């Protein structure tokens, strides 16, 4: 039996999956998919996912579930980031996904988001003995990760998580502009 794993990222902008098979003791990606869902859209205005957003996200997860079955995935990890941390009805979305697909979604902390970003980035940094800073600019938040020395253990970094991503910053600036305009009119 092959070891086949899936990683699913339910982000503020995209929902992504990577399915990997272990071939000759090395990971080989056998499937990748990404769908723009803009989960964070309108969160700045009402702080919840609309019914249509929940329906569309669940539809994407149905496709992911089907693909995981086709590829005989043995194990998976599904994480959700900023949008699900912020929305007041994220549990409704997560339960709907599970009910319709059997996929369990885990909302991760900003620390865990930064840690995962760091370790997925380290393979691309040639000399991380020097000081490095990594920016992870998402749809709902931005993580700044600081590393000073060669990272040997999972806690050897500092990070800052800002609630400003591509979508959230745009919407927050719209809120500010509308209130400023209304103030000027008065």
Regions found by a protein language model. Give the residues of each.
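A short glycine/small-residue-enriched secondary-structure motif
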Residues: 33-40, 70-75, 93-99, 112
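Gly/Thr-rich phosphate-binding beta-strand-loop-beta motif of the actin/hexokinase/Hsp70
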Residues: 1-30, 121, 127-158
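Short, well-ordered amphipathic alpha-helical segments that serve as non-catalytic structural scaffolds
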Residues: 55-67, 184-186
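Short glycine-rich, Thr/Ser-proximal phosphate-binding strand/loop in the N-terminal lobe
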Residues: 14-51, 150-183
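Short, glycine-rich nucleotide/cofactor-binding loops
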Residues: 9, 53-54
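Glycine-/proline-rich flexible loop or hinge segments
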Residues: 40-50, 73-81, 104
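Active-site neighborhood for divalent-cation/phosphate handling
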Residues: 77, 86-87, 94-142, 147
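Short beta-strand-loop/turn "lid" adjacent to the catalytic site in phosphate-handling enzymes
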Residues: 65-95
């Amino acid at each position: 039996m092959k070891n086949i794993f899936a990683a699913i990222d339910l982000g503020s902008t995209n929902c992504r999956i990577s399915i990997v098979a272990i071939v000759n003791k090395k990971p080989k990606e056998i499937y990748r998919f990404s769908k723009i869902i803009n989960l964070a859209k309108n969160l700045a205005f009402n702080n919840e996912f609309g019914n249509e957003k929940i329906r569309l996200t669940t539809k994407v997860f149905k496709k992911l579930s089907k693909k995981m079955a086709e590829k005989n995935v043995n194990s998976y990890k599904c994480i959700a980031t900023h949008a699900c941390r912020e929305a007041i009805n994220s549990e409704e979305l997560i339960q709907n996904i599970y009910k319709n697909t059997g996929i369990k979604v885990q909302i991760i902390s900003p620390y865990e988001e930064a840690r995962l970003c760091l370790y997925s980035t380290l393979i691309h940094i040639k000399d991380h003995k020097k000081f490095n800073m990594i920016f992870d600019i998402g749809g709902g938040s931005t993580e700044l990760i600081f590393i000073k020395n060669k990272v040997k253990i999972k806690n050897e970094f500092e990070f800052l998580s800002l609630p400003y991503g591509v979508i959230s910053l745009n919407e927050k600036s719209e809120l500010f502009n509308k209130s400023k305009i209304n103030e000027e009119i008065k």
